[in-house]
Amino acid sequence: GIGLSANQVGLPFRMFVIGGHPQIEDGKIRNCFNPLIKDFSQETVNMKEGCLSFPFLFLMINRPKWVNVEYTDENGEKIEEYLHGMTARIFQHENEHMNGYVFTDLVSKLKLDRGKKAQAKLIKQTIRRQQERLRNEVASKNVKI
């Protein structure tokens, strides 16, 4: 994952962590307490997103291209930043978790149903690949099952 909100793991804090992933432009890890989106672009970008709360589910989500944000970091310092690209997208996604929304709320029922069908197919493919990998590993060691 590229981000995780405290409430996703049962913690009662208005906080999330983003970063530490090659897709984050500056590679920076941000610990965001009491985050706020102060402004956002009218220009949007439609892009495929996933979420740790919904394994193997990927949906096209339209989001503002940039956001101006404010949060308190782990040292108690108030930070204001202009974020763009994947960093802006992830900040928005995690902020929604804290506000009681998940990315499935942002698409139509039809798009969600299509996404769930693709999710089921991807899960089956992953299981088959793992089974094949294990069979090959066992066979290479001449282990009888």
Protein language model regions, located:
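Positively charged
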Residues: 1-145
